[in-house]
Amino acid sequence: MSSLPNASQLDKSGRRIVVDPVTRIEGHMRCEVNVDANNIITNAVSTGTMWRGLEVILKGRDPRDAWAFVERICGVCTGTTRWTSVRAVEDALGIQIPYNAHLIRNLMDKQLQVQDHIVPFYHLLRLDWVNPVNALKADPKATSALPAALAAHAKSSPGYFRHVQTRLKKFVESGATACSPNGYWDNPAYQAPARPDLMAVAHYLEALDVQKDIVEIHTIFGGKNPHPNYMVGGVACAINLDDVGAAGGRSTCTSLNFVLERIHEAREFTRNVYLPDVLAVAGIYKDWLYGGGLPGHNLLSYGTFTKVPGDKSSDLLPAGAIVGGNWDEVLPVDVRVPEEIQEFVSHSWYRYADETKGLHPWDGVTEPKFELGPNTKGTRTNIKELDEAHKYSWIKARAWRGHAMEVGPLARYIIAYRSGREYVKEQVDRSLAAFNQSTGLNLGLKQFLPSTLGRTLARALECELAVDSMLDDWQALVGNIKAGDRATANVEKWDPSTWPKEAKGVGINEAPRGALGHWIRLKDGKIENYQAIVPTTWNGTPRDHLGNIGAYEAALLNTRMERPDEPVEILRTLHSFDPCLACSTHVMSPDGQELTRVKVR
């Protein structure tokens, strides 16, 4: 496995390609690469183009309200940000939540994982691999044999695919679709035959309904989506075993049965459509093993899907770190230790007193400093090319013990596999065996997993794990309620008079995109300081003062592009991370002037 290059070693002499904005993501992102005479990427620059100021807004506010602000960081992985904020306050105040609340939070969290893995694959990254225009050439009868061979799925008749093809033809011919004017549909990077393309379009449409239905679990337990309700001390939904006082709402029994139906529907789709589709893409593009970068070297997970409340050793996906490419050693992670988690700003549009030193989030500073390097091409309001030797992003550089890390499903799965989690090992071994059998290859874990395709497979496998374990949580919740426990919140420390004068806490979770942490300091009942490090700030990190490069930039290196002006290869790899730039950055004006003033009561 090749060594991880330092920024000082990257070749910037070739042609510069700018992708701005990177589309089919959440938020605003810019990417610049240099390509050599053979169209190989030799340098990559990933930029967050908006400033996030919610940490500043939270200062001086009631910590019980923090979740209502920070969940607005993002409308996609909506519940996980709120949950992590609530956990930080509970940690600071020493609050233990009831078992029912633990199970309900787990169900809501895993539901988000399921939906937020299905949507990126089918609706954000699938068009990097699938040519919908080519699907018009497919024979519906021949296509119907494909899903039958892959898995048992009800919607696989010739008539079904003929109907989808007719809809697609009208859509393309209408001229109102990006399929015709904005796609790179004649790019030789697209290698799939017409039949898999038609099957993919059909499943694209099915996934729209699946993701819409599964998210209704949030509305049952959290009242709405996006931005479902939680509360410090538990969850905001009461257990009501009859209709008395339900104000026209469902009883708990009716609601729980509804939740179970959604779980089974998502499970069927994941096993019979999603996983086979991912393996089908991998089989067609079996030689496209670009997009590795940090997974072969540095990986981080905070751990998630805790079975026993308060016991991180019971995580289905454990916490841990891998550094230096040593997959044989999973290191422990402690997010409270100042030397472990640090933020740097030497290449970010922020100001520190000493920009050669990193700050732990409990001591974090969010002070903007928008300035461009001397080799920037263009103006402050119309940048043509960035000068990455200086400040170039609104994302801070994050490091674990001095290492840039990749986070997300692939990191979680490699760490879980190397930690001996049997469910994960069976999934990975089964999938790799199926890939090798269908392609005639004999790739090992370290050859396949650290790649764009491996990252995409890990997301699908985690979706399967999440939806399977939701059944366990549902059964445990029903059993606990039947045993007479109806508690969903611990309000013993709701009154600020019960709080210490000063306290600090941290809430951690694994969002769909990776490690998520919120660090909070309290003083006199108010928030003194608040810092959030979200997954895209790990993966989208700019370079630090030592030249360490982040996951996005590292993953793009050494990729060969068919046509640099049609950057489908860049999109494939970036979309495999499912970037969420709104989580990592928010808003900026060209010259720092006030854009608007909002009074928040």
UniProtKB/Swiss-Prot annotation:
A Pfam family that the UniProt record links to this protein: NiFeSe_Hases
Cofactors, names only: Ni(2+)
GO cellular component: plasma membrane
Organism superkingdom: Bacteria
Family, similarity comment: Belongs to the [NiFe]/[NiFeSe] hydrogenase large subunit family.
Class in the EC hierarchy, top level: oxidoreductase
Catalytic activity: H2 + A = AH2
Membrane topology (UniProt): Peripheral membrane protein
InterPro entries: Ni-dep_hyd_lsu, Ni-dep_hyd_lsu_Ni_BS, NiFe-Hase_large, NiFe/NiFeSe_hydrgnase_LSU
Protein localization: Cell membrane
Organism: Azotobacter chroococcum mcd 1
PANTHER family from the UniProt entry: HYDROGENASE-2 LARGE CHAIN (PTHR42958), UPTAKE HYDROGENASE LARGE SUBUNIT (PTHR42958:SF2)
Record EC number: 1.12.99.6
Cofactor note: Binds 1 nickel ion per subunit.
Chain sites annotated for binding Ni(2+): 74, 77, 580, 583
Keywords: Cell membrane, Membrane, Metal-binding, Nickel, Oxidoreductase
Principal localisation: membrane
Name by which UniProt lists this protein: Uptake hydrogenase large subunit
Assembly behavior: Heterodimer of a large and a small subunit.
